[in-house]
Each structure stands twice: as C-alpha cells, then as structure tokens.
C-alpha cells in the first residue's frame, strides 16, 4: 500500500513539474542596459506560432524603479476585418539570472476591464543593435505556451548574426512562421 501511495505522489509531482516553463539559458554576458536601449522591434519570425505573432511590434521604455515597460501592439486583418490589440507589459529581471525576466502583462478582457497574465522570458541571443532571440513561456489553463521569437529592428530580411546563432543550435528559419510569409493585411 505504501508503494502505491508513493508511486501516486511521485506521479502527481512529476506532472506538476512538467507543467512549468523551462527557460533556455540566456546569452553569455547579458547586458541589461544595452538590451533595453533597443526601443522598437518587430516580431519577424515565430518558432511555434500562432501566425498572428509575426504581426506584432514591441516598444520598450525604461522605468525609474529598474523595470521596463513594453507596449506590444498587434495589427492584422482576417477576411478584411481589422484586429488591433495592445498589451502593456512590465519586465522585471529575475533574481540571479541576467537575461531572464518575469513579465506581467495587462490584457483587455473585452468587458472594458483588464486581466493580468504572467510570462517568463529569456533573451537567448542579441547583438544589442539589430536583433534578439527571445523565448517566451506562458502558463495557461490549457497548458504551457512556449515560443521563440525573432525580434528585429527591420521588418524585412534576417540579420546575418541571427543565421550564425541559429546554426549553433541547429535551428532553421525555414520551419518558422515568418512576417514575409504571413500577410498581416489579409490573414487567412
């Protein structure tokens, strides 16, 4: 009987830990000041989707308390009908891990109010000027939503630094959702 109880508890614990975000390690020698000096970027590629991810822009400002605020805007059309959303997110550096953040976002709930969601992020790589690879992990009611986003200061093309980083981890942008392949003005 003790073995059955122990096995059951172990199974419950394993399931609980399996439902947590597992962030990839951030890039070496991450510099917070340099990273947040990139004020405006476009999501040009998304590893897991959904395709609407690549119709987003991030605008970041520094706050006096050491946090940063990112305004995430999303604009696209589906069947001619326009969609616009704005998320206001506060990025707080995780204690002891440079390049990882706990992020609180305010999401409009459709009733004129706002709902808060919690996102964990890790800056996998950046050149502090033109691009960043950002892992984003959100725990939802239906499970874990994990993605890697390519953020770039230009909407089109791929910075050469990105290509070498992706090769080092055996990833290819050919398999990712791309802003150039998704028509944000008429998504189907």
From Swiss-Prot:
Locate the transmembrane regions by residue number: none
For this UniProt record, the keywords arranged alphabetically read as follows: Disulfide bond, Hemostasis impairing toxin, Platelet aggregation inhibiting toxin, Secreted, Signal, Toxin
Signal peptide range in chain numbering? 1-18
Q: In which tissues is it expressed?
A: Expressed in salivary glands.
Domain of life according to the entry: Eukaryota
Cysteine pairs forming cystine bridges in this chain are 21-137, 55-184, 89-105
Protein name in UniProt: Pallidipin
**Upper classification of the organism:** Eukaryota, Metazoa, Ecdysozoa, Arthropoda, Hexapoda
């Amino acid at each position: 009987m003790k073995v059955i109880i122990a096995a059951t508890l172990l199974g419950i614990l394993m399931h609980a830990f399996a439902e947590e975000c597992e962030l990839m390690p951030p890039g070496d020698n991450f510099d917070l000041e340099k990273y947040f000096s990139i004020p405006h970027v476009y999501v040009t590629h998304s590893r897991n989707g959904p395709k609407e991810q690549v119709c987003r822009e991030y605008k970041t400002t520094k706050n006096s308390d050491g946090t940063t605020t990112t305004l995430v805007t999303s604009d696209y059309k589906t069947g001619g009908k326009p969609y616009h959303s704005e998320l206001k997110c506060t990025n707080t550096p995780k204690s002891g891990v440079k390049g990882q953040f706990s992020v609180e976002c305010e999401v409009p709930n459709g009733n004129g109010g706002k709902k808060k969601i919690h996102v964990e992020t890790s800056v996998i790589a950046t050149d502090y000027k033109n691009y960043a690879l950002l892992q984003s992990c959100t725990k939802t009611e239906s499970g874990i939503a994990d993605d890697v986003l390519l953020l770039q200061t230009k909407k089109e093309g791929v910075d050469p630094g990105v290509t070498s980083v992706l090769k080092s981890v055996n990833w290819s942008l050919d398999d990712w959702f791309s802003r150039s392949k998704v028509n944000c003005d008429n998504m189907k």
